[in-house]
Amino acid sequence: MELALSQPSFFGTLLMLVVSNLLLWEKAASIPACMVEDGGCWDPLREAFNSATQRAETLRNLSDQLYVEFFQNQFSSRQFADLSSQLIRKDETVLKAGTYCHSNRAKPKSRGVNIDIEEYLKMSINFCGFMDQPLFHLVIELSAMEGVPETILSKAKDLEENNRQLLDDLRWILTKVFPTAEIKEEFPSWDYLSFLKSSNKNHKFLAIFNLSSCLDYDTQVHYTLSQILNCLITGKDC
């Protein structure tokens, strides 16, 4: 499902980041040189970016698989088909659930080509932070629901764990690249948390519909950002 979140313009802005910030590569000069160890040179920052990019790719793949499974598995296929039909009919409640993402609040206001690397690194951290609470509660609620297939529950658990580890990687990278940087990690509550915890089955599936739809978009942003930031900060894999 394609979300109405101005994706083309946002991804266009990310691509502009590559071009417009090439002049900022001198920031890489302030990063400690690689550490010499037996067998060659070890660059901890490079390793952290490799880990972050790998986890971002894993998140993207898992979210795509989970999204498809919710539509195809007997556990949720009927509810997701009904919600999709209501979305097509532009039902106001379902339209919001299917097109508005909690993490959309983490996107900075566009300033054309004047994009700051530190700001986008913080934005990546915020995307992970915004996803942390919904994924945590998704695992709890799925574990308590009857008839949840192991394939769905295991993917939800893997998503939560990989997101948490990616958040740790990004926090570490920020402290190494911008040692004096400050970031306020105050993530607002997920709008659909009360729906997910509700005893009303329709409300619960509406929350799952919102989260699975948004994860499909958010994890692609994660992956794109990690590749661009890796290029700009380390000068590798450009």
From Swiss-Prot:
Major subcellular site: secreted
Segment forming the signal sequence: 1-30
Subcellular compartments: Secreted
Organs and tissues of expression: Placental basal zone cells.
Entry keywords, A to Z: Disulfide bond, Glycoprotein, Hormone, Secreted, Signal
Gene Ontology CC terms: extracellular space
PANTHER family for the chain: PROLACTIN-8A6-RELATED (PTHR11417:SF69), SOMATOTROPIN,PROLACTIN (PTHR11417)
UniProt similarity note: Belongs to the somatotropin/prolactin family.
Annotated protein name in UniProt: Prolactin-8A5
Organism: Rattus norvegicus
